[in-house]
Amino acid sequence: MSSVVFDGEEIPLTVIRSDRRRTVGITVKESGEVILRIPPHISEEEAVSFAQSKAEWILRHRTKFEMRERVERHYAEGETIPFFGRELSIRRVEGDKVRAEIIGDELRLTGPLGTGADVFCEAVVFLYRREGLKLLRPIVSEVSKAAGVEPPAVRIRKQQRKWGCCTPKNGIILNVRILLAPKLVIRYLVVHEIAHIEHRHHQDSFWAEVERLMPEFRDAERMLKEYGWTWVF
């Protein structure tokens, strides 16, 4: 396995060849794994050499992830969880069937005694996907009108890595985790994907459109980078 070394510490690399890439890409995952993506025209030796030049940056990001205390939800009575910019207080209720519902400022979780957090988690994700779609559609409609495009079909999925994507048929898929974020971030992610309908890249024209649609988008980006890891179910 290839690796880089910085300050006496060896950092293993997971090398992935990609026909779609034009440049070498480095990704540091929250698990600490370092992914090195290589285009066809660059040798692994050249790519590893490039990664070595970025070893300090790689180590800094791995250390940052290691210092983070993992966010764990137990779905216990009195615990809180965000939803579309507000905090919901969890209330546990005994019942025959597992279900989750939002009542006022409460997230009411019903289920038999001994129901595990993983079961309630699935119920909450299902609820957020259903209710979140109702709240996202007006934003999508408004932003689409400002962008001069037809409002896209919207789907919400539970995804590990991507916050969202624009499909080849101009639909948008959003990560259910965005519903745990502040409204500013939610709006930014909608703007980001709708801007991709006309700009299928991250070049200057794309970012110009994002800024036109949402001048304060950089504030949302900073929040996403700093706190996104805490928005988990």
Identify the function of each model-found stretch.
Residues 1-187, 197-233:
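Active-site-proximal or metal-binding-adjacent scaffold patches in catalytic folds
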Residues 190:
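Walker B beta-strand of ABC/ABC-like P-loop ATPase nucleotide-binding domains
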Residues 193:
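Walker B catalytic acidic pair
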